[in-house]
């Protein structure tokens, strides 16, 4: 069987070696006589899986000791609703920087629980750039400042950590975590749905500075209390064990491949191939994003008309290049180049783009 190149924005492509290992271990895992999905999450066997996943993630991301790591069920949207409940006092403000669709989602989810203020909004400019941090309107007593590190739909990315003074910086890293080195100590909290760079859909990672867990937050059930999750090693309730196991395999694979430094090199090379095909097409392909904030993970582009967009998607699929249709909010084409996408995939896409232009340009 030949696997196609999957450019899906999420759930996204996973390393083939990880999938093969999971396949081999699905029915009977590690000599225990049962599948990993059948054993208790509180068994010594699974506790070892969970501990290894955290240890490897700490190594991969160089997570400082004064930061706690949680593995939570669900995705980033759930986390966005829980942030103000855990870290904002009743009536307190929180600042949000809106640089795309997911920044808008973050403030929407938080708004019922906090005085959510827009510190900067790139929508008026069409989400093609990121307002400089010096221009943001921050509330001096804000609970936190929230950014979306990489916008998968519009294709803009913070290339540097913004300076927000003494306010805790919270960031959604769902689509760019582990794609390049990151100084986590510059953040109060980062979070990520796993389904782009860390593993399968259905589990997320929250990394939080421990002193922030001392905040009283707002009245909430214990299941929504992050301090309780940390105290119970992410097992306050039954976790998604299969997802956690696959996340652990994926993180271990990234370490074996050379870690975030190596993936930063690979990702820059892959992105350069696709952006090179766009910029060298004489306007046949268009990416509207300011070059300094172009995403390396998600590259949207447009052809001269919607009919050509549709033809591009159809022909690329036939050529073994999957999931290139752009998000319904913006249309066009989108190529997602997460860590598990090999260089050969980016090269195949660039070659196809050149061939398509020769035939239809």
UniProtKB/Swiss-Prot annotation:
Its EC number is 2.6.1.52. GO terms for molecular function: O-phospho-L-serine:2-oxoglutarate aminotransferase activity; pyridoxal phosphate binding. Binds 1 pyridoxal phosphate per subunit. The modification N6-(pyridoxal phosphate)lysine is found at residue 196. Keywords: Amino-acid biosynthesis, Aminotransferase, Cytoplasm, Pyridoxal phosphate, Pyridoxine biosynthesis, Serine biosynthesis, Transferase. InterPro entries: Aminotrans_V_dom (IPR000192), Aminotrans_V_PyrdxlP_BS (IPR020578), Pser_aminoTfrase (IPR022278), PyrdxlP-dep_Trfase (IPR015424), PyrdxlP-dep_Trfase_major (IPR015421), PyrdxlP-dep_Trfase_small (IPR015422). It is an enzyme of class 2 (transferase). L-glutamate binds at residue 42. It comes from the Bacteria. Its main location: cytoplasm. It catalyses: O-phospho-L-serine + 2-oxoglutarate = 3-phosphooxypyruvate + L-glutamate; 4-(phosphooxy)-L-threonine + 2-oxoglutarate = (R)-3-hydroxy-2-oxo-4-phosphooxybutanoate + L-glutamate. The keyword Ligase does not apply. Transmembrane segments: none annotated. GO terms for cellular component: cytoplasm. It is found in: Cytoplasm. Its cofactor is pyridoxal 5'-phosphate. Pathway: Amino-acid biosynthesis; L-serine biosynthesis; L-serine from 3-phospho-D-glycerate: step 2/3; Cofactor biosynthesis; pyridoxine 5'-phosphate biosynthesis; pyridoxine 5'-phosphate from D-erythrose 4-phosphate: step 3/5. Catalyzes the reversible conversion of 3-phosphohydroxypyruvate to phosphoserine and of 3-hydroxy-2-oxo-4-phosphonooxybutanoate to phosphohydroxythreonine. Belongs to the class-V pyridoxal-phosphate-dependent aminotransferase family. SerC subfamily. Homodimer. This is Phosphoserine aminotransferase. The gene is serC.
């Amino acid at each position: 069987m030949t696997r196609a190149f999957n450019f899906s924005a999420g759930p996204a492509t996973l390393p083939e070696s990880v999938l093969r290992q999971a396949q081999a271990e699905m029915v009977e895992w590690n000599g225990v006589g049962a599948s990993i999905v059948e054993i208790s999450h509180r068994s010594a066997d699974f506790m070892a899986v969970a501990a290894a996943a955290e240890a490897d993630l700490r190594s991969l991301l160089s997570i400082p000791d004064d930061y706690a790591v949680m593995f939570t069920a669900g995705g980033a949207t759930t986390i966005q609703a829980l942030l103000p409940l855990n870290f904002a006092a009743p009536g307190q403000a929180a600042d949000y920087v809106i640089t795309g669709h997911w920044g808008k989602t973050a403030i929407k989810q938080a708004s019922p629980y906090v005085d959510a203020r827009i510190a900067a909004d790139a929508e008026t400019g069409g989400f093609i750039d990121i307002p400089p941090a010096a221009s943001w309107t921050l509330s001096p007593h804000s609970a936190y400042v929230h950014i979306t590190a990489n916008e998968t739909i519009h294709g803009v990315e913070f290339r540097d950590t913004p300076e927000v003074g003494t306010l805790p910086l919270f960031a959604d890293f769902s689509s760019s975590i582990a794609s390049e080195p990151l100084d986590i100590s510059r953040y109060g909290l980062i979070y990520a749905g796993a389904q782009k760079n860390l593993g399968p859909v259905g589990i997320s990672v929250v990394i939080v500075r421990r002193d922030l867990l001392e905040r009283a937050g707002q009245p909430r059930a214990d299941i929504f209390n992050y301090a309780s999750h940390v105290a119970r090693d992410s097992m306050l309730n039954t976790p998604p064990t299969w997802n956690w196991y696959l996340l652990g395999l994926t993180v271990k694979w990234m370490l074996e491949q050379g870690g975030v430094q190596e993936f930063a090199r690979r990702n820059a090379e892959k992105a350069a191939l696709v952006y090179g095909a766009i910029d060298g097409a004489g306007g046949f392909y268009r990416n509207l994003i300011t070059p300094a904030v172009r995403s390396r993970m998600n590259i949207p582009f447009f052809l001269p008309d919607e009919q050509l967009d549709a033809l591009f998607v159809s022909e690329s699929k036939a050529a073994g290049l999957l999931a290139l249709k752009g998000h319904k909010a913006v249309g066009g084409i989108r190529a997602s180049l997460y860590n598990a996408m090999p260089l050969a995939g980016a090269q195949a896409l660039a070659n196809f783009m050149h061939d398509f232009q020769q035939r239809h340009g």
